């Protein structure tokens, strides 16, 4: 009997984990550059000749590498990265570097270039934008001051790093950290030398809302089924207990 309860607990935990993944995808559907997480269902080799029950499968979550739709905004501080393996470098605290595809940049009260309130890093460190200047981001990643269609000054060049998304661990709000067990690290990994950006454009998230909603409904049904099985198990246990009490 305990094996039934353990199976229900295991299945329910899988459902909760999957539901958390789906909820995170839907929450970040409007986060520029966010990469959705998908689930891979693998039939265990030793179980191929048995009935296809849930316990016979291995579930593995993985990141969707596909680039999101490039959407024109015409905002001078918006830009998207062309190469799917290139990432903007963000400082989320004095000791922590993160990576993002989110090119929806803003200037804070200190004239610092930020994304989601975190400083964006250039080749020479944090980037500060002069006041009352016409800013243009060029395709090679330079932030330029333009006056009368003439280049006056290059403020900075974005620092980009090249990582496969599997080298990164998701943190929050479209920000990723380098895997702790990865042999690479921020300091010894070379910066991208051939930067390719498009300005006035953002990369949308690659979340498929319809697919995630279907998965969420399916998970809810699976959860209801587990609750019904548990209820039936409790009823059968109580009936067996009453039967035994009548015979003693």
UniProtKB/Swiss-Prot annotation:
GO biological processes: bacterial-type flagellum-dependent swarming motility
This protein's record includes keyword Nucleotide-binding: no
Keyword Glycoprotein: no
Pfam families with a match to the protein in the record: Flg_bbr_C (PF06429), LlgE_F_G_D1 (PF22692)
GO cellular component term, pick one: bacterial-type flagellum basal body
Key words of the record: Bacterial flagellum
Source superkingdom: Bacteria
Cell compartments where the protein resides: Bacterial flagellum basal body
Record text on subunit structure and interactions: The basal body constitutes a major portion of the flagellar organelle and consists of five rings (E,L,P,S, and M) mounted on a central rod. The rod consists of about 26 subunits of FlgG in the distal portion, and FlgB, FlgC and FlgF are thought to build up the proximal portion of the rod with about 6 subunits each.
Entry similarity comment: Belongs to the flagella basal body rod proteins family.
Annotated protein name in UniProt: Flagellar basal-body rod protein FlgF
Species: Buchnera aphidicola subsp. Baizongia pistaciae (strain Bp)
């Amino acid at each position: 009997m305990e094996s039934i309860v353990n199976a229900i607990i295991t299945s329910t935990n899988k459902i909760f984990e999957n539901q958390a993944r789906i909820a995170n995808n839907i929450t970040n559907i409007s986060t520029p550059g966010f990469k959705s997480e998908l689930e891979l269902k693998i039939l265990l080799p030793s179980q191929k000749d048995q009935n296809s029950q849930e316990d016979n499968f291995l579930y593995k979550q993985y990141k969707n590498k596909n680039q999101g739709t490039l959407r024109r905004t015409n905002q001078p501080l918006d830009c998207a990265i062309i190469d799917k393996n290139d990432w903007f470098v963000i400082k989320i605290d004095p000791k922590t570097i993160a990576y993002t595809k989110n090119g929806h940049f803003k200037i804070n009260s200190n004239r610092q270039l930020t994304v989601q309130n975190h400083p964006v890093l250039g080749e020479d460190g944090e980037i500060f934008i002069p006041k009352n200047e016409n800013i243009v981001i060029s395709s090679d990643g330079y932030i330029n001051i333009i006056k009368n269609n003439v280049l006056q000054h290059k403020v900075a060049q974005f620092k980009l790093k090249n990582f496969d998304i599997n080298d990164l661990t998701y943190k929050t709000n479209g920000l990723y950290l380098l895997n702790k067990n990865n042999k690479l690290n921020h300091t010894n990994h070379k910066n991208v030398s051939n930067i390719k950006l498009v300005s006035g454009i953002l990369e949308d998230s690659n979340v498929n809302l319809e697919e995630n909603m279907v998965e969420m409904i399916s998970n809810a049904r699976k959860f209801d089924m587990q609750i019904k099985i548990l209820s039936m198990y409790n009823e059968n246990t109580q009936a067996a207990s009453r039967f035994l009490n009548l015979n003693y």
